[in-house]
């Protein structure tokens, strides 16, 4: 592969305009087509074969309600000291309905004065507006007309909010906070390269690759079920790895230029060596992300595949676009000669010396720090974000709060129960009544509707309003209590609703995490054994990754679930940990951890093979690869941290997990714990049984064999004046 990439890098360097034009054409085509085709995201997070999904299937089969029609709920709130049942407020609401009904696409309006959907104190009410078309087909004009009509009620001092199938929700790809992350990444690159111009180039190439992947994901929504959070996740990961991968090739190119190698040859060698490591690292991340498909959860599979696509584009940009940009940059990439810096670099290696002199202290401190941070993960609670976890000024949150204020917290977490009396031994109507009575007797039940049977009378729907909100532990306990009543008197109870769905998703993900973790850890151990030809180094690396994950979950629980520092991170409300965050973080952080492990430890192995001196090998790795890993880690942290301050709760959670995960893994595990433990192991760190050494393949990750092959061909170039 190194030889092939060497050839590719050389060709791109010589045909830079063609390469850049090709990328521009692909970028314009992808974005243009994505804009032309209106994105159609699917927010369906259901999982096949779960109890809540089975309940929905029964409802659709046994309670057919005709064509699927879009419905929007309008919530009204009275002014201070007023009631909606008063004449002025009632007239304003009725006039509003008259104005709304002028839209021909409106099928019906369920007035609260007819249906009785008014709070006991008369301060809050809601009306369901049903349209003739499905939710996806509700026209922008209809939404505008609805909002304009509500201004009539607003002018009378009423509060109006919308919930339900409201199209046109803002799609978050990026924002001010993400731009701040890019700016901080730019600062890191400027310090690393000592040039503002060069610092901007890796960001430019990363953004081009990201633009293509975003366009492809948007196009993909026309064919596949992709959630909007998948787009943000793909953008987050694609940008971070795109900058990092470009950084590795930029650094290698400058190193070769500093050795006196001609420009195009230097680019070819940089792509052949660092590019090989980038391809290996990228494929590792892609495999980890695509591995999310093994859990057999549709929306998780979509997240993994879209994020994997963004990493693939980052890799392709690194080995085809970056060489073209380097060729255009020309002599500007040559590092400035500074004898003082060269002398310091040669004679000193502060961190490497410190680590090898204090391995016990650093090992113990690193492990203790990560264990302490991991403690909160012991009371991890999983769930899915609801409108109550959004910012208080968010329209969905305002609607959520207004309904909770009028009808109680549990109104937003209603449970829909499907009662199946097919096998009932008594009269089916009496069996349904008994089931309702049993449910009313449970703790924390605010209200229960009478059973509404289907035509045949063998199925019925019962709606339960809990006393607590959808993500409250008490509500989750109520779901389990209702399910435990199943089969009494021959009535089977299937529960659905947001809380029931959350429980089922959490249970399925909890079952999937051990399987996925075993696959990832096993894959990592085998992979690193092949790369480093050692047993103990991979073992320590995997153990370090496990500490990274527990610490990452610990900080997430500490902040997101327990509510510590939520004001600092601008998180509106504390709540359960995003149900898919643990397994998603395992996949992403595994790939990134292997990146840092390969870039750092492969340099150590190279030195150990030469000198057979483990201490010298550790110091060489930290000296030569440490600065690049440090810069790459900081860039990742800044980019991911920018998403903590995004608007969407799920994106905030992922941004927090990934930024702290990289912090723990890059700086505590890879730069401190791993070299410290390797110092304690000495030569044993590189032990590999002879029989195993003969079996496993010899993998050249960073293209060292390539350098040996082409060196005779380019020796004469080093004697010439650099031609740029």
UniProtKB/Swiss-Prot annotation:
It holds the Pfam family MMPL. It is a multi-pass membrane protein. The chain crosses the membrane at residues 17-37, 179-199, 200-220, 231-251, 277-297, 309-329, 360-380, 512-532, 539-559, 575-595, 627-647, 655-675. One of its GO terms (cellular component) is plasma membrane. Gene3D superfamilies: Multidrug efflux transporter AcrB transmembrane domain. Keywords: Cell membrane, Membrane, Transmembrane, Transmembrane helix. The keyword Transmembrane helix applies. PANTHER family: MEMBRANE PROTEIN MJ1562-RELATED (PTHR33406), MEMBRANE PROTEIN YDFJ (PTHR33406:SF13). This is Membrane protein YdfJ.
